[in-house]
């Protein structure tokens, strides 16, 4: 019951704030360490997956040592160890289907309530607690001072949809269309936030998940895609804010670049884009620190310094995963990170597809869309993003007979 409460509280703790989320994860980690010491079961340490995670932790410690400023990245890099323990705790307790079902039902209720609040804010301008006016049409929901609710829903909705398919295969043919509508309910909430990158990831995730879903015939899959496209078009035609976010600020500049035959016009159009400037800045930092990078969380220190390169753009990170890796970890660190992360994710694809475990498939889909090139993203090693990433990775391993690091041993 103790661990059931802590795991059930994870999504709500993220909404309440980073301090509460961190406290909850540390409570899970510390409690699990004592629990595993009491059980004296350390066979999991010989598992290849666990060894890869230990290697990732060791690399991040090394990254702190060679960073421009040790103190800037040390807290983040050393703190990463908690996600390794978090991963093990998920694998141990999600061994039990009863535990999984109880936890994910509460997660589903939490996400549904947050999504309904997003709909309310899109209509009234404020959420149920009155948050939202400070950001105008941008939706914040219960996050109060950060417009990140779209990314949050995107991080959890495939877990919930996968869980509904995973819950009872015998009744799926009867209820699969209800689950499909539930999926579109979540994606619509993401689109309403105006978070373009997360909307693209959510839509691509929808396509991939349902394309690989054997409960739908090919014709049903095509109709599902058309339904989502119609919903998207309807939303754009009924909201000036969404027209601006997706049309004026996203599709129009891309179309202008492709339609122009003049290199000067293309360069001028590209220079108007904030993200192009951020990507260029990230690449400039990489050019200066090619081998090992400037160090995790040191990007801001480099780009905001007094003696800065005119191509630098002062910010906390380059807002794109691959440029972030190159700038802060260099070519060596980027190769190490991509090798470990891709090994953790891609090595299990065949097992997941053959087992037809849709909870695993939902998590896998989210993880794959996290690595789409060029799309803007939050800082990968920031607590909020890393928490959602490792929740998906942990569940993907934990609920499979051939992937759970304890069950496998």
Predicted stretch roles:
Residues 71-75, 143-146, 193-201, 315-320, ...:
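Membrane-interface catalytic loops of GT-C/OST-like multi-pass glycosylation enzymes that act
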Residues 49-56, 70-93, 102-111, 151-156:
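Aromatic-anchored transmembrane helix interface
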Residues 10-11, 29, 61-62, 85, ...:
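Alpha-helical transmembrane segments of multi-pass inner-membrane proteins
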Residues 1-72, 98-101, 105, 163-177, ...:
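Transmembrane signal-anchor hairpin modules in multi-pass inner-membrane enzymes, especially those
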Residues 120, 192-193, 213-266, 280-288, ...:
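A membrane-periplasm/extracellular boundary helix in multi-pass inner-membrane enzymes
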Residues 27-33, 158-159, 203-207, 340, ...:
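Transmembrane alpha-helices of multi-pass inner-membrane enzymes
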Residues 328-350, 390-393:
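Selective detector of the "anchor" transmembrane alpha-helix that sits immediately C-terminal
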Residues 128, 264-329:
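Long extracytoplasmic/lumenal interhelical loops at the membrane interface
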């Amino acid at each position: 019951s103790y661990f059931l409460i802590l795991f059930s509280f994870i999504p709500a703790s993220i909404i309440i704030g980073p301090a509460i989320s961190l406290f909850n994860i540390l409570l899970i980690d510390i409690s699990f360490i004592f629990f595993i010491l009491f059980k004296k079961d350390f066979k999991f340490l010989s598992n290849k997956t666990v060894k890869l995670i230990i290697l990732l932790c060791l690399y991040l410690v090394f990254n702190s040592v060679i960073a421009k400023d040790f103190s800037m990245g040390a807290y983040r890099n050393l703190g990463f160890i908690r996600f390794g323990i978090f991963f093990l705790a998920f694998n141990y307790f999600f061994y039990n289907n009863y535990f999984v079902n109880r936890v994910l039902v509460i997660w589903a209720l939490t996400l549904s309530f947050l999504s309904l609040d997003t709909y309310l804010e899109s209509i009234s301008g404020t959420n149920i607690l009155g948050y939202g006016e400070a950001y105008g049409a941008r939706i914040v929901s219960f996050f109060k001072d950060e417009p990140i609710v779209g990314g949050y829903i995107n991080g959890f909705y495939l877990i919930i949809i996968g869980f509904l398919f995973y819950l009872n295969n015998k009744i799926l043919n009867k209820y699969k269309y209800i689950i499909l509508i539930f999926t579109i309910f979540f994606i619509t909430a993401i689109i309403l936030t105006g978070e373009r990158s997360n909307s693209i990831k959510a839509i691509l995730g929808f396509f991939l998940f349902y394309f690989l879903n054997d409960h739908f015939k090919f014709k049903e899959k095509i109709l599902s895609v058309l339904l989502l496209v119609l919903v998207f078009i309807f939303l754009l035609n009924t909201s000036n804010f969404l027209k601006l976010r997706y049309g004026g600020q996203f599709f129009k500049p891309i179309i202008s670049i492709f339609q122009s035959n003049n290199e000067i016009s293309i360069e001028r159009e590209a220079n108007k884009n904030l993200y192009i400037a951020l990507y260029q800045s990230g690449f400039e930092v990489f050019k200066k620190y090619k081998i090992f990078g400037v160090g995790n969380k040191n990007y801001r220190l480099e780009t905001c310094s007094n003696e800065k390169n005119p191509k630098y753009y002062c910010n906390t990170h380059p807002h794109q995963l691959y440029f972030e890796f190159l700038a802060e970890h260099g070519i060596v660190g980027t190769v190490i990170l991509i090798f470990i992360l891709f090994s953790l994710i891609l090595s299990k694809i065949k097992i997941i597809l053959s087992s037809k475990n849709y909870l695993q498939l939902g998590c896998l889909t989210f993880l794959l869309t996290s690595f789409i090139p060029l799309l803007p993203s939050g800082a990968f090693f920031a607590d909020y993003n890393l928490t959602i990433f490792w929740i998906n990775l942990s569940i993907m391993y934990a609920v499979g007979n051939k992937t759970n690091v304890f069950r496998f041993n």
